[in-house]
């Protein structure tokens, strides 16, 4: 949205200028501790080039093992993922707003991460904009 590709959307008269300003002021990533465990939240990847699409089958997924965190929460692809890569639990909750087509149906999803047990619960829900398949 903030890249040159999002210029048209930013200029749309329905776009809230204050929200765009707020978004531009946000950091690219957030790090924090939960119960002594380090969590990294990022939209796409913490390495260059930013904005890479890391799908569950992507070879670059292994690069998350280099991240100094116990958990990495990322998005961008809208494809749900919960996988340990090296010592890092990598989670993509999917998408609650714009669905992902997994080959047989459009899926909306979210995830709950238990930082104590390190279990990830996937929550799927229907998108009324698309007919039910599968």
Predicted stretch roles:
Residues 1-71, 77-80, 84:
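Conserved catalytic scaffold of divalent metal-dependent phosphoesterases
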Residues 12, 16, 70, 104, ...:
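Acidic-enriched, low-complexity/disordered segments with a strong bias for Aspartate over Glutamate
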Residues 38-46, 89-94, 122:
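Active-site-proximal beta-strand elements of phosphoester/diester hydrolases
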Residues 47-48, 97, 127-130:
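Short, surface-exposed beta-strand-loop junctions and turns on beta-sheet-rich folds
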Residues 51-54, 101-102, 129-134:
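A short, polar/proline- and glycine-enriched secondary-structure boundary/capping micro-motif
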Residues 55-117:
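Conserved beta-sheet core of the metallophosphoesterase superfamily
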Residues 118-134:
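A short C-terminal boundary segment appended to hydrolase-like catalytic domains
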